[in-house]
Amino acid sequence: MNNLKRVVVIGSGFAGLSAACVLAKEGYKVTVLEKNSQPGGRASVWETDGFKFDMGPSWYWMPDVFENFFALFGKKPSDYYNLKRLDPGYRIYYGKDDLMDVPAAMALMEEMFESIEPGSSAHLREFLAQAEYKYKVGMGEYVFRPSHSITEFIDWNLIKKSFSMQLLTSLRKHVRQHFKNPKLVKLLEFPVLFLGATPQNTPAMYSMMNYADLALGTWYPMGGMNEIVKAMVKLAEELGVTINLDTEVTKIEVENNKVSNIITDKETLQADFVIAGADYQHVDQKLLDEPYRNYTDKYWDSRTMSPSSLLFFVGINKKLNSIEHHNLFFDEDFEQHAKEIYTNPQWPSKPLFYVACTSKTDDTVAPAEGENIFFLIPLAPGLNDDDATREQYFDMVINRFEHITGESIKDNIVVKRSYAMNDFKADYHSFKGNAYGLANTLAQTAFFKPAMRNKHIKNLLYTGQLTVPGPGVPPALISGQIAAKEAIKMLS
């Protein structure tokens, strides 16, 4: 019966591929439409002159989410790619000759905390025990709810557990109740950068990210993050999914409150159901006529977006000894940078930045005597983006990188590419050029997020980082599963 039912998935990011796989396993005929020339959405890859760069996500956290996804199909991540746990997980530079390596082993982590703030190892155990509880409740009972309405959360067992989730306490306050040393505070507040809000505006529930970071660890799929995309594409094709690349959806036509036609720049398709994994705002405002939109322009403009980013992909013809795979440069004032992202949006005066050098772990991503370096500066979304400004910031981060690490790279650059707001918009129709979707503030959590269901169209659902559960690769995998299960219910 299901073989007769056709589902079109718009977008081949993690959420779209996840939804496609779940639907295909249930016997639906699934076609994925992808506007770009490679699948994976933001997790695309750029290869040039022997260098290979992941252009989007670079952190592999929450390995259990990937294991659980592949287990739905009787598979394991190791059937498709080789995972390596990084040790140290990452390095933080607080200034010149002032760094912290974050160890994989918990005993060494406790030793490090104790050496920085005497007595803090006991606080760390207590803090991580609370974070583990939040992670297990959040990832087990909250995250798979489609959040159509508050009634899904009116469950006495869940309400009792919610009191321990610290929804109304800020992460900033929660961290400072346990730790005083500024270095430890920065270490524990850093993961919320992935959630797109400041620690004072992020619920303490999200200390679950500290459990993901410090206890579950930082991993790397050999070959790069795009290996996950390749794995999901292979799985999808094994399940019978058709993926059409270089195919952009230009219009969704509706008749009798159902999608009648999906018009692309190549052809017109019909489907029994549509799951939109492309940028939600773009689908809502650009692909649908006004009567069928979930939201107004005013609504979208009032959303708090997570940051965008200015990225630089740099290949050099020398080896580096004094950096790790993941490196965070916290040598400037976090508060000032946060204000310039969230309070008074502007190009930052002295930004924090992040550097990935995957060739430290993986010799397949750069020539033998070279390194591939990825620089990321978090920015307010919607800023004016031009080449002159990009160059100014490139010079700034290269100078600071060289000063702090003691490594000279300026004269060894053989490959360079920048990527920022205009590129996010052009490649992904990204609203305001955002990189990470909606900020995970309390007012944009669960049923306060843009709805997964279209209110006016019976056979259209949304998935991805602008709806539930939120930004990040593991949440996108989960979002696709939720959308697929909802679609199956609605099609039954």
Give residue spans per PLM region:
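N-terminal glycine-rich phosphate/pyrophosphate-binding loop and immediately adjacent elements
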Residues: 3-136
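A glycine-rich dinucleotide-binding beta-alpha-beta segment and adjacent secondary-structure elements
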Residues: 181-195, 350-354, 407-469
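Active-site-proximal substrate-binding core of FAD-dependent oxidoreductases
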Residues: 254, 489-492
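C-terminal segments that line or cap access tunnels to active or ligand-binding sites in enzymes
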Residues: 317-422
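Mid-domain catalytic core of redox enzymes
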Residues: 250-366
